[in-house]
Amino acid sequence: MRAGLVLVDQLIRSGVREAVLCPGSRNSPLNLAFVEAERVGRVRLHVRTDERSAAFLALGLAKVSRRPVPVVMTSGTAVANCLPAMVEATLSGVPLVVLSANRPLSMLGSGANQTIDQAEIFGTHSVCTLNTGELALEGAAAGAAGELRDLVRKLINAATDPIDGGGAHLDVPLREPLVPPTLDELSLWAGEIAAAEDAATTEGAHDSHAPSQPTRGPRKLPYGQVEVDLSRRTLVIAGSVSDVAWARSIMDELADVPTVAEPVAPAPDFPVHSAAVDMFSTQVVSDGEHSAVTIPEQIVVIGRPTLHRGVTKLLANKDINVIALSDTRNVTDVFDNVDEVGSTVRPRGEQPESWLQVARAISDMGVNQVRDGLAEREPFTAVHAVAVVADALRDGDLLVLGASTAVRDASRAGLPFDGVQAIANRGAAGIDGTISTAVGAAMAHAHADPTAIRAPRTIAVMGDLTFAHDLGGLNIGPLEPRPDNLLIVLTNDSGGGIFETLEPGAENLRTFADGTAAFERVFGTPLDLDFAELCAGFGVEHKLATSVEELATVIDEHAEIGGSGITVLEVKVSRRGRQEIEKRIAGTR
């Protein structure tokens, strides 16, 4: 029990301010230690009964707060349920910390209940994997407090490392007794442990030979500076990054360069609409009277762009000089043709005015294509719905986007915008845990300014498959903190809308000659869910919109009245209509 108190005390001293707990017997020492810490105001807790949802809740909290957030669970498959969130955390550089209880290691392979080999369960998806071994076993902790604290420091430093940070895992074998004799004794022990560390820290401050607490100096970057010759036709492509502030600094240096930015990137000074990216792959464009070279000579990649096939086509062109910039060791080089890698830039020269004119014209064409494509409001699709949401965004809003169609539709709607932070789980681009991520993100967003009269708004946008995949994210107990102002826009097209525009959605692949459904069965995957009833079961407010006008009205009303917890705004849209909209936007009506 004392080991749990030591570990939790050090986690808080190392920057933890929120923690997600899952019920279990083996993790009792950790859970009770966290409850005591919350009782005295040191941390805020969130309890969830589903470990997968819990891990994504912690991911959302950590993604927005940029602080390490532990998720605590018992042994066995409970730990395995954290794998999807750990994959996303490590690929996105988010400090998610899995704190798993375990049986003593001597029991592994003995047939003991709820015992699996979980020490290395996350493999390369954990940036740091540690095990307390026998240090946390009852009777050993009294003399092992210093070693336990060192393990926590190492764990948190690894998770929050600006270059190599991400998901981290501490496995904690524990042996009975797992609970204190009384809660009063628990509080007494916690006070003694904290006081002893306070005294040691104070004494260490006067002892030049004592180890000091690690401090963060100026941000280190993995790569050096790259010179960018702006006299060449240059296009910047900005994708998802670990540190938005770093990306912003790069984009400020390249402010005069045409930039295609994904919704989760900072807003560029010279935006180029993503709908027009394909035109940059054409060597010369002519209207019969005038012609212009539209292919760039060089591309500067910031972070990891993954959304647009037109961008992928450009990056595959080996005749274009590609400069890849990253603030982590992960470098985007899908086609093995990156010419230079860096973390900062030194621009020289200026962009040719003729190139800037071409880029503006191409971007305007993209904007007009989208505007014309959405001018007709029938069929009403998710693309229309996301455009309405984009128009309704205000300074200070946080936008959480589903990783499938929602983030792509947001790009069509013109994001990113100044004053609006957008996030999406694009590390592994899975739809897992999107509701839970949004709930965590919304609470961290509101917690950033606890003095605000009204909680800032978080809007999450996702399709029905993404929503249904994480319904458990709405399962928030009556004793738990919950978002004050979260609007979830659920675009319900009864199935997988993204496949309508991919190769499996071709007309000749939809149905066999005998009428057997191919596309609809395994790609369309229609749902028959009553989302109003589902929301009612979780005690969540549900609203419905069936047109552009209704959707805009409900969003405006929600903004004016203010949030009252979680509201799900279901938008009934057409799935087959997406093909028609895509053709309109592409100009091939």
Swiss-Prot record:
<comment type="pathway">
    <text>Quinol/quinone metabolism; menaquinone biosynthesis.</text>
</comment>
<keyword id="KW-0460">Magnesium</keyword>
<dbReference type="GO" id="GO:0070204">
    <property type="term" value="F:2-succinyl-5-enolpyruvyl-6-hydroxy-3-cyclohexene-1-carboxylic-acid synthase activity"/>
</dbReference>
<dbReference type="InterPro" id="IPR004433">
    <property type="entry name" value="MenaQ_synth_MenD"/>
</dbReference>
<feature type="region of interest" description="Disordered">
    <location>
        <begin position="198"/>
        <end position="222"/>
    </location>
</feature>
<comment type="function">
    <text>Catalyzes the thiamine diphosphate-dependent decarboxylation of 2-oxoglutarate and the subsequent addition of the resulting succinic semialdehyde-thiamine pyrophosphate anion to isochorismate to yield 2-succinyl-5-enolpyruvyl-6-hydroxy-3-cyclohexene-1-carboxylate (SEPHCHC).</text>
</comment>
<keyword id="KW-0786">Thiamine pyrophosphate</keyword>
<keyword id="KW-0808">Transferase</keyword>
<keyword id="KW-0474">Menaquinone biosynthesis</keyword>
<dbReference type="Pfam" id="PF02775">
    <property type="entry name" value="TPP_enzyme_C"/>
</dbReference>
<dbReference type="InterPro" id="IPR011766">
    <property type="entry name" value="TPP_enzyme_TPP-bd"/>
</dbReference>
<dbReference type="Pfam" id="PF02776">
    <property type="entry name" value="TPP_enzyme_N"/>
</dbReference>
<protein>
    <recommendedName>
        <fullName>2-succinyl-5-enolpyruvyl-6-hydroxy-3-cyclohexene-1-carboxylate synthase</fullName>
        <ecNumber>2.2.1.9</ecNumber>
    </recommendedName>
</protein>
<comment type="subunit">
    <text>Homodimer.</text>
</comment>
<comment type="similarity">
    <text>Belongs to the TPP enzyme family. MenD subfamily.</text>
</comment>
<dbReference type="InterPro" id="IPR012001">
    <property type="entry name" value="Thiamin_PyroP_enz_TPP-bd_dom"/>
</dbReference>
<keyword id="KW-0479">Metal-binding</keyword>
<dbReference type="GO" id="GO:0000287">
    <property type="term" value="F:magnesium ion binding"/>
</dbReference>
<dbReference type="GO" id="GO:0030145">
    <property type="term" value="F:manganese ion binding"/>
</dbReference>
<keyword id="KW-0464">Manganese</keyword>
<comment type="pathway">
    <text>Quinol/quinone metabolism; 1,4-dihydroxy-2-naphthoate biosynthesis; 1,4-dihydroxy-2-naphthoate from chorismate: step 2/7.</text>
</comment>
<dbReference type="GO" id="GO:0030976">
    <property type="term" value="F:thiamine pyrophosphate binding"/>
</dbReference>
<dbReference type="GO" id="GO:0009234">
    <property type="term" value="P:menaquinone biosynthetic process"/>
</dbReference>
<dbReference type="InterPro" id="IPR029061">
    <property type="entry name" value="THDP-binding"/>
</dbReference>
